[in-house]
């Protein structure tokens, strides 16, 4: 029987590392707030068209590196490979284009490439 392991390029963050990650995130949040930045959180899953339009249809990211699937209604969704496009979409969709100009974000991003 095949031994089930994490997917290549994906990493478990175990309790000892979670403490470090949390500390760094708290430091980032505190520092960003002092300079007027506001946190934003976007979905991990986005309409694939968002990345095709913003990153470019012929780029390696779109053609080779995104984790994409099509649902039963033929909608194409991708796990976010980067954060800029999702943040821009959220600000526009949320009607915040005239009220917010300094944001920060953190979170997982997904690309099918060799782990570093």
Predicted regions and their residues:
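TRNA-recognition modules of translation machinery and tRNA-sensing kinases, especially anticodon-binding
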Residues: 1-116
């Amino acid at each position: 029987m095949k031994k089930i392991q994490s997917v290549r390029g994906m990493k478990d963050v175990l309790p000892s590392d979670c403490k470090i990650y949390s500390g760094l995130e708290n430091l980032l949040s505190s520092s960003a707030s002092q300079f007027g930045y506001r946190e934003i959180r976007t979905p991990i899953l986005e309409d694939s068209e968002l990345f095709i339009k913003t990153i470019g249809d012929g780029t390696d990211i779109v053609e080779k590196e995104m984790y994409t699937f099509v649902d039963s209604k033929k909608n194409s969704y991708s796990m976010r490979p980067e954060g800029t496009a999702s943040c821009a979409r959220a600000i526009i969709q949320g009607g915040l284009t005239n009220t917010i100009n300094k944001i920060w974000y953190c979170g997982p991003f997904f690309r099918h490439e060799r782990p570093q």
